[in-house]
Structures are given as C-alpha cells and as structure tokens.
Amino acid sequence: MATAVEYETLYTGQKIPLIGLGTWKSAPGQVKDAVKYALGVGYRHIDCAFVYGNETEVGEAIKESVGSDKGLSREEVFVTSKLWNNKHHPDDVECALRKTLQDLQLDYLDLYLMHWPYAFKRGDQIFPQNPDGSVQYDLTDYKDTWKAMEKLVKQGLTKAIGLSNFNKRQIDDIISIATVKPAVLQVECHPYLAQNELIAYCHAHGLVFTGYSPLGSPDRSWRKPEDPVLLEEPGIIAMAKKYGKSEAQILLRWQVQRKVVSIPKSVTPTRILQNFQVFDFSLSEEEMQLIGALNKNWRYIIPLITVNGKSVPRDAGHPLYPFNDPY
C-alpha cells in the first residue's frame, strides 16, 4: 500500500520528504489517527508546532508507529516543530524545545523552526493580550533567538534549524550572524502565492523551501464568500480530469516539480492517501506554466484578531511584520 517518496536534501545531508503531513488545525481526537494512518501509507515527514496544541497526540501516534518492533525506525521519519512567539527570549528557547520533545516523546527533532520573526510578551500565555484585544509584544531580536537555537543543534536536541514566515531581508539578517545556517524556510505557498522570487533566493542560499497551505487552506475559519477558491480553478479541474487525479493532487504535483516541499493537512484517510500519491505522473512544461500564471500574490494566512470589536490583522503593526516587503 505504501507509495515511494521523493526527497530534497538539506545542506546538513538530511533528506526531507517532498510531501509531509501538516497538523495545523487538526483537532485533538483526530490528529493521532491521522498521523498513524499517514505513517502507515508511507508518509515519512510530519510537520508540527507547539502552538497547534496537539503535539501530545502526535507524539502518541509516532510512539505507536515507530520503533524497532514496528518495521519503521526513528531515523526514517522527519519530524519538524516550531518555536512559538512567547518563547523567543534566549533563556526560554531550550525549555520550549524540551517541552515539545517531551510532548512528542522524542529524543531529538529533525528540524526546529522559528515560527514567526517577532516575539510576544514572555510567559506562558500563548496569545498575551492588551485590554483592547491587541497582542502584547516583546522586543527580543530574532538574531538573539537564533543564537539560542544554534545551541540546540550543538546539544543534539535538533539536527537542523530554520525559519518560518520570514522575508528575504530578515533571512539575510539571520545569515549575516549565523554560525549554524538556516536549513529551511517555511511559508505559505500555492499557485495564487507562487513565491517565485523567494524560492529562487532560498535555493541560491542553500535553503530548502517548504510551502504550507498548498491547497489554499479551504478549511480556514475566516474564509470570506468573495475569496478566490484555488480548488475551483477551471484549469486545475481540467488537468485533474486529464490525469484522473484530484485537483489537490495537481496542485501538489506542481510543487513537487518545483522542488517545493509541501505539507498538506488532512485528517481524512482518503485525502491523506491521495495527497501522497503524486509521484506517479508528471505535468508538462506548458501545464506548469499555466498553473504558475495563476499567481496573484494572494495570501490566505493572515492571522486576525478582534480589537475594539473590529477584525484586524493580528501583527501588521509590529515593526518585524514580514509581509510588508515584496518578498
């Protein structure tokens, strides 16, 4: 039943599967079965984060699926997690990773990402708030956070470190002070947000590029009726019919051929399996260009909060907000 998987290689020599299982928005009670099923059908890459609130269940699934007596070794599974914004202070970074390792029941991660470039107020509140509903920030410099993350590699707690939701200027900042280079950049990426410049930049600087929400996050709670729907694009539907594949498989194949790692989220077995079955066909160069031409720099994932009764972008006012730059 298992499908062969293709990989990209990090500068560390690690191999990261081009398709992984995303776990954002996967509810406790569902995510354990989803991870177990995914590992059973051949997934070898699980993408996690502390803020998703489900790492304990993900850990149970890994424990029940991986081990010398289960035919799947720990070394065969690539596990990513992410440092949340309230733990950016250098003194908090190691504790944050150790908490994730405890929840996942692992001795080490394959990759640990800084989830966002800006810090929230130190403490145990995941979303510390001001009285008006806005977020309480902290001015910890991400370069100082990075230096603390480098120590985690030297301690053997993670094999590689990387960045999420950083722009080019911010990645340059990190590279300028790094003694352990970032191995991966993870950002939103799909045909409406093709990220061509950022992908080219990453590949030129030795970073593997991972795209989250590769299907356009159709299950996002803040969806508006007027938002464009990627899975309903006529050209994508036509290609799906031509190849006898789902629209999701066409979108994921496009990323595979661009050497972009994708982490589609699902808790539905049929979709988990479908999302993985993208290595047995290829899109033509013309089809790749047609999909690429859908780019409109449309960002689905902009966290929103309610401030004084109005819905506003959560972090757009922060000086380190990454999405004001062109890329």
From Swiss-Prot:
The keyword Metal-binding does not apply. Keywords: Cell membrane, Cytoplasm, Lipid metabolism, Membrane, NADP, Oxidoreductase. The record marks 82 as: Lowers pKa of active site Tyr. CDD domains: AKR_AKR1A1-4. NADP(+) binds at residues 13-24, 47, 164-165, 213, 215, 217, 265-268, 271, 274-275. Its EC number is 1.1.1.2, 1.6.-.-. InterPro entries: AKR, AKR1A, Aldo/ket_reductase_CS, NADP_OxRdtase_dom, NADP_OxRdtase_dom_sf. GO terms for biological process: aldehyde catabolic process; cellular detoxification of aldehyde; lipid metabolic process. Pfam families: Aldo_ket_red (PF00248). GO terms for molecular function: alcohol dehydrogenase (NADP+) activity; S-nitrosoglutathione reductase (NADPH) activity. It catalyses: a primary alcohol + NADP(+) = an aldehyde + NADPH + H(+); S-nitroso-CoA + NADPH + H(+) = sulfinamide-CoA + NADP(+); S-nitrosoglutathione + NADPH + H(+) = S-(hydroxysulfenamide)glutathione + NADP(+). It is found in: Cytoplasm, Cytosol; Apical cell membrane. GO terms for cellular component: apical plasma membrane; cytosol. PANTHER family: ALDO/KETO REDUCTASE. Belongs to the aldo/keto reductase family. Catalyzes the NADPH-dependent reduction of a wide variety of carbonyl-containing compounds to their corresponding alcohols. Displays enzymatic activity towards endogenous metabolites such as aromatic and aliphatic aldehydes, ketones, monosaccharides and bile acids. Acts as an aldehyde-detoxification enzyme. Also acts as an inhibitor of protein S-nitrosylation by mediating degradation of S-nitroso-coenzyme A (S-nitroso-CoA), a cofactor required to S-nitrosylate proteins. Also acts as a S-nitroso-glutathione reductase by catalyzing the NADPH-dependent reduction of S-nitrosoglutathione. This is Aldo-keto reductase family 1 member A1. The gene is akr1a1.
